[in-house]
Amino acid sequence: MQNKKRLAEKALEQGNGILRLAPTWVPRSFCRPGKRIKLHPDDYFVLGQRGGIDERWFSSTTWAENGPDTPEDEGLSYVVVDDEGKEKVLLRDVVELLGAEVIGETLWNKYHRWPMFSKFFDNAGPLPHHIHHRDQHANRVGASGKPEMYFFPSQLNNHGGEFPFTFFGLNP
């Protein structure tokens, strides 16, 4: 843990308080990539039966639960320490080790972790039906709720895919 703390402090110092994160690519076996997330065309299906890469996660301290073959660091953002990218440490570890110094007193005192992340979805077709529970329901199984919002910037969507719509279930 001492080496991780040294790397975390070094990254924070080198960036003058800004952490440089490596890209975090996440495959999904139940979706097909729309090929708009600026990944090399040869790399969308590099993980074979685990699925095509159709998500890029940002500032993530959340493990991607993708079944039994999921690597222990899938979905987790790495802080890059050196220019060559050889020295790196998980953002999750940086937050755990440096606490309020890196995420501020308000978030640290309330959550004692980094409680959010962003992602680019890039699906060729519509997402399958799924649900994200609120905290009150997720807490029953020892999990946190997952509030979501969707934004479709035209600069990153040069075409709409096969079905450029999304549906939301609303409880008025």
What are the functions of these language-model segments?
Residues 1-172:
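Transition-metal
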